[in-house]
UniProtKB/Swiss-Prot annotation:
InterPro entries referenced in this protein's UniProt entry, alphabetically: DnaJ_domain, HscB, HscB_C_sf, HscB_oligo_C, J_dom_sf
SUPFAM superfamilies in the cross-refs: Chaperone J-domain, HSC20 (HSCB), C-terminal oligomerisation domain
A Pfam family hit: HSCB_C
Function summary: Co-chaperone involved in the maturation of iron-sulfur cluster-containing proteins. Seems to help targeting proteins to be folded toward HscA.
GO biological process, one term: [2Fe-2S] cluster assembly
Alphabetically ordered keywords of this record: Chaperone
Residues covered by the J domain: 2-74
GO cellular component, one term: iron-sulfur cluster transfer complex
Residues that span the membrane, as ranges: none
GO molecular function: ATPase activator activity; protein-folding chaperone binding
Protein's UniProt name: Co-chaperone protein HscB
Membership in a protein family: Belongs to the HscB family.
Length: 171
């Protein structure tokens, strides 16, 4: 059973996050291992496994990029283990330039430039994210998979920039 079905939700990218949260809480209560403490060893093990599945499904569906990757996996795209890389050379060059810029910002310890950089990367991410949403809605799986690969780069870059921001603030 896929995670969407497990949570009683349609298998699509855009979902009702409130319904997801409520269903998660219901499933947690229903299958919490403590409820099976007096049960047989097999029942206890099954409860622990079910609880782990609930938590994994919850983590996957609540995180937008993970949810997109999971939805694509249901359509034959195993992005988590695939060896496909982004073949868009212009995008890759842009990523290299952005990484170099982030390194320069770190060397200069330039907080104002870093703030501007983070905003720019967030805007780039948001633009591509919206494109991905449209591609998934239109079931353009190949295009969506390519966009998700690019979003991974941007997500890592954003994370690196935010870590640098914390480092500079602690300095």
């Amino acid at each position: 059973m896929d995670y969407f079905t497990f949570f009683g939700l349609p298998a699509r990218y855009q979902l009702d996050t409130q319904a997801l949260s409520l269903r998660f809480q219901d499933l947690q209560r229903q299958y919490h291992p403590d409820k099976f403490a007096s049960g047989s060893q097999a029942e206890q093990l099954a409860a622990v496994q079910q609880s782990a599945t609930i938590n994994q499904a919850w983590q996957t569906l609540r995180h937008p990029l993970m949810r997109a990757e999971y939805l694509l996996s249901l359509h034959g795209f195993d992005l988590a283990s695939e060896q496909h890389t982004v073949r868009d050379t212009a995008f890759l060059m842009e990523q290299l330039e952005l990484r170099e810029e982030l390194d320069e910002i770190e060397q200069a310890k330039d907080e104002a430039r870093l703030e501007s950089f983070i905003k720019r990367v967030k805007k780039m991410f948001d633009t591509r994210h919206q494109l991905m949403v449209e591609q998934l809605d239109n079931e353009a799986w190949d295009a969506a998979a390519d966009t998700v690969r690019k979003l991974r780069f941007l997500d890592k870059l954003r994370s690196s920039a935010e870590q640098l921001e914390e480092k500079l603030l602690d300095f």
